[in-house]
From Swiss-Prot:
Modified residue annotations for Phosphoserine: 8
Provenance organism: Tityus obscurus (Amazonian scorpion)
GO molecular function, one term: toxin activity
Highest taxon above the source species: Eukaryota
Name the record gives this protein: Toxin To46
Tissue specificity note: Expressed by the venom gland.
Subcellular location(s) per record: Secreted
């Protein structure tokens, strides 16, 4: 979900 900002938290 957070991947849109962090890419690695996905």
């Amino acid at each position: 979900k957070e991947g849109y900002l962090f890419g690695s938290r996905g």
